């Protein structure tokens, strides 16, 4: 009797192993039939069946068929843990409050988003633009009267007047040159920066921080061409050398032998009255005209002199 029971049990296990693949497919079909044949009121009342997992890969002997009232055969797993069944029942009982809470949270988020956008809760689609610049917000009105930054004003002016962009393109200059600061002059930089004239000075930008821009050769060439067109600074001193006549060298073809001798300075009365400091000046003899005889006691210069002993001797000998 026991051997017959064991043989029949082994045969049933072999049959189940052979038909394992067909049973998994039939289980899914049976579950779908049960769902489609159930009424909507039953689905709304109990949703625990939604949380039951479908195990298509099951070992043989782990499934059995259950026939319910007014329903087809539904295959359920006999190896399911009781804990999973309890969790499914608990989740099925609490699924409806969770769905309501989720719906309320979604409504609150929609209300908060619509309030922040300044529109009503009914009008969910928002106006994102006129089609040309969709997604680009217009400039907010300057209600507080605060001064705007120069870059914003220039960008706004460039957007309002597209002719300036055409002027830049006509001149062959990129748009960055119009907004960039001119390069400082080397001489002005030495005077202003205490000798640091080669250091570039650029204005601070609040929107661009920590970005090192490497200029291209074309951009540098355009900037140099623009700086050349600037008017010269009238306050800068000219660096032309002053020619001194005394230090001027003669031309190479000049002959030194033909140079005129330096002129003597005119003599003054001090040279005669101060013989110590000035050289002696030769004075011509004043001879009387022929036929006249000067007085022996009167010299040629007109001043009377006393006779010396030699003069007396010559007179006596004569």
Curated annotation (Swiss-Prot):
Modification type Phosphoserine: residues: 249, 257, 260
Record region (Disordered): 1-23, 54-318
Basic and acidic residues bias spans: 7-20, 99-110, 150-168, 175-193
Keywords: Phosphoprotein
Comment field (misc): The P/V/C gene has two overlapping open reading frames. One encodes the P/V/W proteins and the other the C/Y proteins.
Protein name, per record: Protein W
Native species: Sendai virus (strain Ohita)
Lineage: Viruses, Riboviria, Orthornavirae, Negarnaviricota, Haploviricotina
Gene name for this UniProt entry: P/V/C
